[in-house]
């Protein structure tokens, strides 16, 4: 058989389908179910199956808190059990997810060059000197990526820190008290 590549974008909510006369948008679960159907349809007929997933299914939730499921880890294990040998993704939220399938090829392509190239092409008026530009990381999880950007651009790095009031609960959540920049003042 031939090598088969499946492209599945679980974050694409623009696709719709009609269900009992109502237009529904495809959820990540719908995309993942369709991917499994396609894999089942060609299983045993291909030499090697690879899945290209720009954003991993369930990949934003990378650690278990209390009794939550780890959808991404389970999905990767399911795909491996179905015969998928390669997963290709872009900028995984937490690349440690590959530990769920240590015997399967897992390529995490970092699009940092493409991001900088597109930024410069579409905003040529930007000045990357320390007096006019700063890279801000939205949270601790993105700090390594933004450290790379600030190093390449030769500018300062800041980070949002979400200070929460843990004494109050609003709709089951702790409200954010303030956003503060850590690092040089902005």
Which residues are covered by each model-predicted region?
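PRPP-associated nucleotide enzymes
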Residues: 1-186
């Amino acid at each position: 058989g031939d090598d088969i590549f499946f492209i599945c974008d679980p974050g694409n909510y623009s696709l719709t389908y009609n269900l009992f006369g109502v237009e529904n948008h495809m959820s990540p679960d719908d995309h993942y179910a369709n991917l499994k159907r396609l894999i089942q349809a060609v299983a045993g007929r291909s030499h090697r199956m690879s899945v290209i997933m720009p954003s991993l299914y369930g990949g934003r939730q990378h650690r278990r808190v209390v009794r939550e499921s780890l959808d991404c880890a389970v999905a990767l294990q399911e795909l491996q059990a179905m015969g998928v040998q390669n997963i290709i993704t872009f900028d995984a939220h937490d690349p440690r997810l590959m530990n769920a399938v240590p015997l399967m090829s897992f390529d995490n392509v970092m699009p940092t060059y493409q991001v900088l190239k597109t930024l410069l092409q579409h905003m040529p008026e930007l000045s990357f000197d320390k007096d006019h530009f700063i890279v801000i990381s939205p949270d601790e999880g993105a700090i390594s990526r933004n450290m790379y950007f600030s190093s390449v651009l030769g500018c300062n790095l800041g980070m949002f820190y979400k200070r929460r009031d843990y004494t109050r609960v609003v709709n089951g959540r702790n409200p954010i008290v303030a956003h503060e920049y850590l690092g040089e003042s902005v």
